[in-house]
């Protein structure tokens, strides 16, 4: 988002450790506004092993315990509500690590709607009840299949059928389904569009989903219609 000329405002949790301090320093150096709260859990760290310009394996360092107690949850929500008047759009990036629970997601979606702010969600898992009434969700094909309970093949008709069911079930405004080499499909009640890719030699797919979400957020925040 920063690279696209936006001024992001980050609200999240950090471990009180070296990696957490490094992230704070990076945000400060880049001038990224943030409210980052320290917890007793270590900062989740991902190490990518690269060979011949391609990712070979990724090592994740984290704990399995819930990182969000009631006090921290309230701090997080209060921070989001303070940030809302200063932003044009809200992105919930859910990595399934315990921060984006049902309460947090629903309160953020509700508070954003109350101020007329669109909410984009990069989802994780099959519990989409917590994303109810979001503006747009960006699942990949595997995630679409899992949440719909259907074995969805990478074909326009099957993707649209599954997406239509999900839109109605969770009262969503739209879905943007990423489809690897077949591009993306945008599905909303009144309009749908399949967007093909242009062939490129891919060296590293890391962050492809994040790039889609960031570009979408920047465009919508600038008032560009889908």
What are these regions (language model features)?
Residues 11-13, 50, 92-95, 122-124, ...:
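Generic beta-strand/beta-sheet core signal
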Residues 54-57, 182, 193, 214:
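Glycine-centered loop/turn positions within well-structured domains
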Residues 169, 173, 198-226:
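Conserved post-catalytic alpha-helical subdomain immediately downstream of the catalytic base
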């Amino acid at each position: 988002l920063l690279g696209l000329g936006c001024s992001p405002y980050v609200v999240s949790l950090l471990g009180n450790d070296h990696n957490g301090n490094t992230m704070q320093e990076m945000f400060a150096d880049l001038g990224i506004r943030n409210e980052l709260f320290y917890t007793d859990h270590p900062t989740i760290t991902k190490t990518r092993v690269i060979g011949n310009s391609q990712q070979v394996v990724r090592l994740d360092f984290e704990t399995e315990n819930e990182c969000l107690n009631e006090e921290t949850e309230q701090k997080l929500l209060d921070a989001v509500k303070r940030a809302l008047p200063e932003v044009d759009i809200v992105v919930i990036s859910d990595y399934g690590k315990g921060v984006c629970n049902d309460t947090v997601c629903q309160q953020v979606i509700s508070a954003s709607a109350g101020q007329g702010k669109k909410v984009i969600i990069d989802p994780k898992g099959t519990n989409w009840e917590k994303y109810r009434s979001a503006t747009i969700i960006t699942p990949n094909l595997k995630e679409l299949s899992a949440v719909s309970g259907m074995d969805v093949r990478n074909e326009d008709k099957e993707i649209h059928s599954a997406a239509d069911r999900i839109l109605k079930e969770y009262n969503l405004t739209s879905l943007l389904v990423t489809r690897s080499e077949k591009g993306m499909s945008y599905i909303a009640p009144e309009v749908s569009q399949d967007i093909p890719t242009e062939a490129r030699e891919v060296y590293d797919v890391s962050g492809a989903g994040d790039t889609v979400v960031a570009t979408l957020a920047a465009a919508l925040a600038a008032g560009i219609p889908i």
